[in-house]
């Protein structure tokens, strides 16, 4: 097994202390509080809060239990873990392919940490900022309404190259999903032919069985921590009613009464919370009814979701952010999808499609609300989402978007994008990131630095840090929903940077825009020392070749201007 403490950075600062148990930093958290006066003026009050942030250095042995383990995403994740663990290679038409984790921000993206002696940007892999779970050490288990073992489930999914499937089939054939909860009222009727591996009994009996399964997995595998993640079929929305599920006590009573509106995904979430396991919802249904959120808060167990943000929606959250930020007014967004995998088959039913439509439609709301120069209080773009089931295209989802925007003097600009997404190969790395960052979040705490008696405080149970990976981010009550991909990514980077005593990335680069020789005798460098084997990161300055854009794409580019792009 590979070592789990893969952090290779040492920050040289009196504000950073490292011992066998924790990385602890003294951190000045700076924000601005805005007040509106009676005459409409905005008064901005900069604020600084002195904090201590500590991160546990011990990385636990992590177990991941997938609901829908035998589906496209579950079988692909299991296959990818095996292929990467064995560093497999296989032949394709275009040559030899090696197993990798492209599409994962923890495994295949880098983070800016500072500038070197030549003024060049230095990036390191995100996974090296803090001790994180190594994917090779993750143990997977789970449930599925289909009893196929994982080898046959992988073949049924038709996602991976056959040359790879043949190398790992025997290993995956030894893995078989536990029986799962099947309620035909919540998923499409066309899924009934798969349902040969189900938990019988009342909802309470199903809940108790899921709890037993989690305990059994923990004991048999010897894992220290378990995360449960829903990657099964999209359910219809459950009704939310007083007396049914608006409080934790109502929800528990409804479970005990076998109420028909307690969905399978909510039962899984309740069981996970009862066992102290982080629960992540990768589908768009309203698993997290108010009573479930309250239950997680009472038990202080993390929940996160909703719905993997992998393809069309991720592009939409970037493009609309760009347009609105550029002072261009999107007035119409039409999104069309067709796909042929089992997700598409399930979504061909109207109630299940409605769950997905809601998830995909709300992604631009916060960006529209950010610019009242473009939009009035109740104004927003026309936004329509269409999903169709076309069996022949399989997992190769086709997404077509048309963005119409108003520009200067009544002009219009139209952007049309065609996006072919291999659905499960985009979603699977997100699952990996969700469980790795979800586990890391359990080891991060902070407290008031000015009060020695102040308690250490963890993240709130609604883990909004994972919003970057979700179409419809779940946030704590009273918090603002952020869909802007740039802001979501910046939150992850800056929190990880704060955990090792580095300031937020500001992009001010004052040392490049002003003559610092008249200000200080010291070079304007972050004092960061790389220990062990240094990262293979080149710089770009004045026409030199470099890989300083945060990507390792195998090709060095020549800088042709002085702006670093």
UniProtKB/Swiss-Prot annotation:
Ligand binding (NAD(+)): 70-73, 144, 180-181, 191, 194, 231-234, 282-283, 307, 310, 341-343, 356, 394-395, 423-424
InterPro entries cross-referenced by the UniProt entry: Myo-inos-1-P_Synthase, Myo-inos-1-P_Synthase_GAPDH, NAD(P)-bd_dom_sf
Residue ranges with Polar residues bias: 550-565
Disordered as annotated region, ranges: 546-565
Modified residues (Phosphoserine): 536
Cofactor: NAD(+)
Tissue distribution: Higher expression in adult heads than bodies.
GO BP terms: inositol biosynthetic process; phospholipid biosynthetic process
EC assignment: 5.5.1.4
Compartment(s) where it occurs, according to its Swiss-Prot or TrEMBL record: Cytoplasm
Molecular functions per Gene Ontology: inositol-3-phosphate synthase activity
Keyword annotations from UniProtKB, A to Z: Cytoplasm, Inositol biosynthesis, Isomerase, Lipid biosynthesis, Lipid metabolism, NAD, Phospholipid biosynthesis, Phospholipid metabolism, Phosphoprotein
Protein name as annotated: Inositol-3-phosphate synthase
Gene source species: Drosophila melanogaster (Fruit fly)
């Amino acid at each position: 097994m590979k070592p789990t403490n893969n952090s290779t950075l040492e920050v040289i600062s009196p504000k950073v202390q490292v011992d066998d148990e924790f990385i602890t930093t003294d951190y000045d958290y700076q924000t601005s509080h805005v007040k509106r006066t009676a005459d409409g003026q905005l008064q901005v009050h900069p604020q600084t809060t002195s904090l201590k942030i500590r991160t546990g250095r011990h990385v636990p042995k992590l177990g991941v239990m997938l609901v829908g383990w035998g589906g496209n995403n579950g079988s692909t994740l299991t296959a990818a873990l095996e292929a990467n663990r064995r560093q497999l290679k296989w032949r394709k038409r275009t040559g030899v392919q090696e197993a990798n984790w492209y599409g994962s921000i923890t495994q295949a993206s880098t983070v800016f940490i500072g500038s070197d002696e030549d003024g060049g940007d230095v990036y390191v892999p995100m996974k090296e900022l803090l001790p994180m779970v190594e994917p090779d050490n993750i143990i997977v288990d789970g449930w599925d309404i289909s009893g196929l073992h994982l080898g046959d489930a992988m073949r049924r999914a038709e996602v991976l190259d056959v040359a790879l499937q043949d190398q790992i089939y025997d290993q995956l054939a030894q893995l078989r999903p536990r029986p799962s909860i099947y309620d035909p009222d919540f998923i499409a009727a066309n899924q009934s032919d798969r349902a040969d591996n189900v938990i019988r009994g009342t909802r309470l009996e199903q809940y108790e069985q899921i709890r037993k399964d989690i305990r059994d997995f923990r004991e048999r595998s010897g894992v220290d921590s378990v995360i449960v993640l829903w990657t099964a079929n999209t359910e219809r929305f459950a009704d939310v009613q007083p007396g049914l599920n608006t409080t934790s006590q109502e929800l528990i009573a409804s479970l005990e009464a076998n109420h028909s509106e307690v969905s399978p995904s909510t039962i899984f979430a309740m069981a996970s919370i009862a066992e102290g396991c982080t629960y992540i919802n990768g589908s768009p249904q309203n698993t997290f009814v108010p009573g479930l959120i309250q239950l997680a808060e009472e038990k202080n167990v993390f929940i996160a979701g909703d719905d993997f943000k992998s393809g069309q929606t991720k592009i939409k959250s970037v493009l609309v952010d760009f347009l609105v930020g550029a002072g261009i007014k999107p007035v119409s967004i039409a999104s069309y999808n067709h796909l042929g995998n089992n997700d598409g088959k399930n979504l061909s039913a109207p109630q299940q499609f409605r769950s997905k439509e809601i998830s995909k439609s709300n992604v631009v709301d916060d960006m529209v609300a950010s610019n009242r120069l473009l939009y009035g209080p109740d104004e927003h773009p026309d936004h329509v989402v269409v999903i169709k089931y076309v069996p022949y295209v399989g997992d190769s989802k086709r997404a077509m978007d048309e963005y119409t925007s108003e520009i200067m003097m009544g002009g219009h600009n139209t952007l049309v994008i065609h996006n072919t997404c291999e659905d499960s190969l985009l979603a699977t790395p997100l699952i990996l990131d969700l469980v790795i960052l979800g586990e890391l979040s359990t080891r991060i705490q902070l407290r008031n630095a000015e009060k020695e008696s102040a308690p250490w405080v963890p993240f709130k149970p609604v883990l909004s840090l994972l919003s970057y990976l979700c179409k419809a981010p779940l946030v704590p009550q009273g918090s603002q929903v952020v869909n802007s991909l740039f802001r979501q990514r910046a939150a992850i980077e800056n929190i990880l940077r704060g955990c090792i005593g580095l300031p937020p990335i500001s992009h001010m680069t004052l040392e490049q825009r002003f003559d610092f020789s008249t200000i200080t005798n010291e070079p304007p460098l972050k004092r960061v020392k790389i220990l062990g084997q240094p990262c293979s990161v080149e710089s770009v300055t004045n026409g030199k070749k470099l890989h300083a854009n945060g990507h390792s794409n195998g090709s060095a580019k020549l800088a042709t201007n002085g702006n670093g792009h």
